[in-house]
């Protein structure tokens, strides 16, 4: 916002300076401008002013574009930070799931071992019971004991398989979710990398353009300072400007008697009894007014101009 305010101030200053320069040019008479525009000097000055305006406008646009690019880069950096945070969270969650998986798998292994030991113990018990009671229960068939063993083994096996399958499904779901999240984060990082590359290219091009514009503006400014004021050619204002530097010398030297007007001569002839102090005051006032009129007017050498040039310009 500060840079935009500066560019607005620069543009307003340039517009005011151009308006003042245009007013200075329009104060001269129309024949003067039409005649001397034939040489091409005034047109060159206008072209230089237009080029300066364009350079300032381009510089303001470049500053605005650089500000927008900086804002977009800040936003992208924020998005990258958020994505990195989500990625860290997902990785931590994935590690937790792996740890839980390892813990649950360890529990399953212990359960399997316990079940195997229990089955072995039961088999030992059954075998001992069969051996001890073989004589008493010869009439009974061995099919009943086998059925009991098969039922117990199938029941424990179903529990183990169900528990293992459930845990396996949960781990597969968690792995799929983490893979999708990692893929999305990778694609986002790739897009952000591409955007940052394009931003760096744009910033480099903007810097090169800005340096070129600054160099051109400096060259134009040096050229504008070196060239003389075209609007004062053919007038007596240049002599008045030279006389302004010798103001102290003119103040010390008394005005000549040829500068006295006819009204002063008549006043002296009509009133010879006036004091010398009043005469000196009136002479100083007339001299000051004469100098002001001389500085304010613009003399055009009409005698040096040919009538055919005036008719061609009209």
UniProtKB/Swiss-Prot annotation:
It comes from the Eukaryota. One of its GO terms (biological process) is meiotic DNA double-strand break formation. Residues 1-22, 241-314 are annotated as: Disordered. Residues 281-290, 303-314 have a biased composition (Basic and acidic residues). One of its GO terms (molecular function) is identical protein binding. Keywords: Chromosome, DNA recombination, Meiosis, Nucleus, Phosphoprotein. Residues 12-22 have a biased composition (Polar residues). Phosphorylated during meiotic prophase. Dephosphorylation seems to be dependent on DSB formation. One of its GO terms (cellular component) is condensed nuclear chromosome. Signal peptide: none annotated. Disulfide bonds: none annotated. InterPro entries: Rec107 (IPR015159). It is found in: Nucleus; Chromosome. Interacts with MEI4, REC114 and XRS2. Component of the MER2-MEI4-REC114 complex. Essential for meiotic chromosome segregation. MER1 and MER2 proteins must interact directly or indirectly. MER1 might be responsible for regulating the MER2 gene and/or gene product. MER2 is not required for mitosis and mitotic DNA repair mechanisms. Component of the MER2-MEI4-REC114 complex which seems to be required for meiotic double-strand break (DSB) formation. This is Recombination protein 107. It comes from Saccharomyces cerevisiae (strain ATCC 204508 / S288c).
